[in-house]
Amino acid sequence: MGLEVKGLMHVGYRIGAQADQVPAIVNFYKSVFNLDIDPSRPTIPTIPGAWVQLPHSTVKPQFHLMVADGVSPAARSARQDPTRTHIALVVKNLVEAKKHLEAVGVDYWVYSGLVGMNSDQVFFEDPTGNLFELQQTG
């Protein structure tokens, strides 16, 4: 049995190294795409940025805009950097998802508490190095 993906959560990508550029970039997303900014984004001291809300989805997929240049302060290494461009998926059960990744021989790493006290994010790469994130919600 494979992962039980419930939907796309977000796509995260870097927007440069200067936090003072965030308002102008946010304005671009608001004005060009008519998208709202998620006001519930927590302050992440090591990753300034914004979450752009996308419409018409139960999970409400987002663009995560992250300020970073080179390896981010939140990273454990260049490879294990949560600010790398990635696709985040919502899964039904994160424990089962990790078991499945282990069963199929996929190495992963976990960030706990990065975006909230009880948050767990599982990251792994596809064979070509594209980064994926798994989270369980509700």
Q: Where are the regions a protein language model picked out?
A:
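Exposed loop/turn and edge beta-strand positions of beta-sandwich/beta-sheet ligand-binding modules
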Residues: 46, 83, 118
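Conserved short beta-strand elements that form part of the metal-binding/catalytic scaffold
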Residues: 36-78, 124, 131-136
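Helix N-cap motif at beta-to-alpha junctions
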Residues: 18-19, 91-95
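Vicinal oxygen chelate
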Residues: 1-9, 40, 98-138
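Short hydrophobic/aromatic beta-strand micro-patches
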Residues: 14, 53, 88-92
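Short amphipathic alpha-helices within nucleic acid-binding modules
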Residues: 23, 95-100
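Amphipathic alpha-helical segments
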Residues: 20-37, 104
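N-terminal beta-strand motif that seeds the catalytic metal site of vicinal oxygen chelate
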Residues: 1-26, 85-87
